């Protein structure tokens, strides 16, 4: 609740699409770095950021960890800004940004999925994450959890902000 109150001034900047209302509130760089470290990102990873905004998570994953990355966002201005940030960081060969609804994003290639979405959006996305991602894929969320039935593997705090990590479990035999 406190996190929602703190982000209230930014609530005016909404991204819209098929019932998806997510405010554009960028994660601070220290939170981004914590997210990537918590997920133990390495050069062999593909980091997919759903609701990438200005691309800072994907850009940092490429720049600091050597990972490849894909960012999805509905807003063409955010995609343009993300591409500019990738070019400025000289990582445009490792990242790409796609203008698309996050529920239509191709997430199967991801070994790390990053989120800074509202709780209801996380919960709506959860069945897809569990169904489409390979066991061992790391999912990291800034601030918001995935509901009561999927507890984080680990939660850390950075400057009063929570970062949650989940690992996609092995599927039961026959699934």
What role is predicted for each listed range?
Residues 55-59:
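Glycine-rich SAM-binding Motif I of class I
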Residues 11-45, 76-109:
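S-adenosyl-L-methionine
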Residues 68-73:
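Conserved SAM-binding motif I beta-strand of class I
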Residues 44-53:
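Conserved class I S-adenosyl-L-methionine
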Residues 1-9:
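Bacterial N-terminal signal peptides
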Residues 108-124:
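A short SAM/SAH-binding and catalytic strip from SAM-dependent methyltransferases
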Residues 120-175:
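C-terminal substrate-binding/active-site "lid" region of AdoMet-derived donor-dependent transferases
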């Amino acid at each position: 609740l406190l996190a929602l109150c703190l982000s209230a001034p930014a609530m005016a900047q909404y991204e819209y699409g098929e019932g998806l209302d997510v405010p554009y509130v960028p994660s601070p760089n220290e939170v981004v770095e914590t997210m990537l470290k918590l997920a133990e990102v390495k050069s062999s990873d593909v980091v997919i950021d759903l609701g990438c905004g200005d691309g800072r998570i994907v850009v940092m994953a490429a720049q600091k960890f050597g990972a490849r990355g894909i960012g999805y966002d509905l807003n063409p201005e955010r995609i343009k800004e993300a591409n500019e940030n990738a070019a400025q960081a000289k990582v445009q060969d490792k990242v790409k940004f796609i203008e698309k609804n996050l529920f239509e994003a191709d997430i199967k290639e991801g070994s790390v999925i990053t989120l800074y979405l509202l709780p209801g959006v996380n919960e709506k996305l959860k069945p897809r994450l569990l169904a489409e991602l390979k066991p061992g894929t790391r999912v990291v969320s800034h601030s918001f959890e995935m509901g009561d039935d999927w507890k984080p593997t680990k939660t850390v705090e950075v400057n009063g902000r929570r970062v949650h990590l989940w690992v996609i479990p092995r599927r039961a035999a026959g699934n």
